[in-house]
Regions:
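Acidic carboxylate diad motif detector
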Residues: 52-166
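Generic detection of short hydrophobic beta-strand segments and adjacent strand-loop junctions
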Residues: 5-9, 138-142, 206-209
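Positively charged, helix-rich recognition surfaces that bind polyanionic ligands
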Residues: 3, 17, 148-151, 163-384
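Long, hydrophobic, amphipathic alpha-helical segments used as structural scaffolds
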Residues: 34-41, 90, 94-101, 175
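Gly/serine-rich nucleotide phosphate-binding loop at the start of the catalytic core
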Residues: 1-80
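Stable alpha-helical structural segments in soluble proteins, enriched in small hydrophobic residues
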Residues: 33, 82-93, 369-379
Length: 384
C-alpha cells in the first residue's frame, strides 16, 4: 500500500533558490497553458491537451523564443506535472465538476515542486536526510519520521512546498500491507458542531480549540499585524512600489501567524481522531454536512471555516482505512438533531438556540448528544 508522509526540511540557500525557481517556472507554465487554451477557444480553434501542449512547448515554442530557454533549466518532471494539473482542471470544468480554471498568482496560490522516482538512486531516505532529484541530499528537521531506504521502504514520488517562509516535503512511500483484525467493539456516532468540536455517542466531548486562550491571543495579534500591513499599503496611493522590503517583511509576519493558527487547528484534529480510533469501534457514523451552504451564512461562515470540518472527514477516512474501521456517512437530510433517540418522534420546530432536547415522551438530553446517538443507530447511510 502507499502512504504519504509530510515533514519540514532544512535546505541550503542554494537549494532554496532552486526550489523557488522551479515553483516559479511551474506557475508560469501552468498559467501559460491556461492562457493558450483560452486564446484557442476565443479563435474557435481546437482545445489542446496537456500532452500536445508539452510537445508544442518543447519542440516549437521554446526553440522559436530563445528568451524562454530558462523553462528548460528546472526539473522537467515538475514542469510536466504542472501541465497535467492544468489539463485536469480543464477536464473537471468540461465535466461540470468545477468552475473555469483560475490563473495562479505568486504569493497567493499553492504551487508545489513535484518529483518522481525514475531509478533506484533518484529518491532515497536516511534517518536525517532525503535525496530529491535536482536538489541532492536535503536535511530533515524531524529525524526518523519518514521510513528509510535502508529498512527496505521505497519512495514513489513527492512534492516540495513553501509556506510562510518554511519548506516542506511530502512523499508517497510504498509500505507492506498490514493484516487488520476485525473490530468487535460497538460502533459510535459523531456529531460535529460549533459550540463543541465533536460529540461522541459514548458521551465523550471534544472542545472547540478556537475558543482556547492561545488561539484568541493569536487572533488579536493577527489583527494588529494585518492593520500594520494595511497602513504600509498606503504607499499605493502615492504611486510607489508595493515590493519594498518592509512590506514583504510584514506580509511574512501575517503569513506566519496564519500558518501557526492553522497548525494548531490541524494538530487538534489529528489528536481527536487518534483518540477516537484508539477505542477500535466496529464502525463510525458521521453526518454529511453541507459546509458550502453553511459558509453562505455570514454569521457562521468564520466559525465554520475555522473548524475545518472537511479536513476532519478526510483525515478520519484515512485513519479508518488504516485500522479496518467502517466509516458511514448518514444522509444529508437525516434529522439527527430533531429525532428523539428514545421514542423516534421528530420535533420539527426545533430551533438552533434550543441546546437541550425535550420530547413529549419525557426524554431530556443534550441536543448534540442526542444527534450523536441517532447517528450511531442510523439505518440510511453510505460507506465513505
Amino acid at each position: 500500500m502507499l502512504k504519504s508522509f509530510k515533514t519540514e526540511i532544512n535546505p541550503t540557500e542554494e537549494q532554496k533558490a532552486r526550489i523557488r525557481r522551479t515553483i516559479g517556472t511551474c506557475r508560469y507554465v501552468y498559467n501559460f497553458y491556461l492562457g493558450h487554451n483560452k486564446a484557442l477557444h476565443d479563435n474557435g480553434e481546437k482545445f489542446m491537451t496537456g500532452k500536445d501542449f508539452s510537445l508544442w512547448l518543447n519542440n516549437e515554442y521554446i526553440p522559436d523564443n530563445p528568451d524562454k530557454t530558462w523553462i528548460r533549466e528546472v526539473y522537467s518532471k515538475a514542469v510536466k506535472k504542472s501541465i497535467e494539473d492544468g489539463c485536469t482542471a480543464f477536464t473537471r470544468f468540461f465535466k461540470h465538476q468545477s468552475d473555469f480554471p483560475k490563473f495562479k498568482k505568486k504569493g497567493k496560490s499553492d504551487v508545489k515542486m513535484y518529483f518522481v522516482r525514475n531509478n533506484p538512486k533518484d529518491c532515497q531516505c536516511e534517518r536525517h536526510r532525503l535525496k530529491i532529484p535536482t536538489l541532492g541530499w536535503v536535511r530533515i528537521k524531524e529525524k526518523g519520521y519518514i521510513p528509510t531506504t535502508k529498512d527496505g521502504y521505497m519512495i514513489r514520488s513527492g512534492t516540495v512546498s513553501v509556506k510562510a517562509g518554511r519548506f516542506y516535503v511530502s512523499v508517497l512511500v510504498e509500505i507492506p500491507d498490514v493484516n487488520i483484525n476485525n473490530n468487535l467493539n460497538e460502533g459510535i456516532g459523531i456529531d460535529l458542531g460549533l459550540n463543541d468540536f465533536a460529540i461522541i455517542s459514548n458521551g465523550k466531548t471534544y472542545r472547540n480549540i478556537n475558543k482556547s486562550a492561545g488561539l484568541k491571543k493569536l487572533e488579536k495579534q493577527l489583527i494588529r499585524e494585518q492593520r500594520s500591513l494595511s497602513r504600509k499599503y498606503e504607499s499605493l496611493k502615492k504611486g510607489e512600489s508595493t515590493q519594498r522590503a518592509n512590506i514583504q517583511k510584514q506580509k511574512l509576519k501575517v503569513q506566519k501567524l496564519h500558518h501557526k493558527m492553522d497548525n494548531i487547528r490541524t494538530d487538534h484534529i489529528n489528536k481527536t481522531i487518534a483518540e477516537i480510533v484508539k477505542t477500535k469501534p466496529s464502525y463510525i457514523t458521521i453526518e454529511d454536512l453541507n459546509v458550502k451552504g453553511m459558509m453562505k451564512n455570514r454569521c457562521l461562515s468564520k466559525a465554520v471555516a475555522s473548524q475545518k470540518f472537511y479536513e476532519f472527514r478526510t483525515r478520519l477516512k484515512a485513519k479508518c482505512d488504516e485500522n479496518g474501521i467502517e466509516l458511514r456517512v448518514a444522509d444529508r437530510f437525516y434529522p439527527s438533531s430533531k429525532t428523539c433517540h428514545h421514542c423516534g418522534s421528530v420535533r420539527k420546530n426545533l430551533k438552533l438556540s434550543d441546546r437541550i432536547y425535550r420530547c413529549e415522551c419525557g426524554y431530556v438530553a443534550d441536543r448534540d448528544l442526542n444527534a450523536a446517538l441517532n447517528l450511531k443507530d442510523a439505518k440510511t447511510y453510505r460507506i465513505a
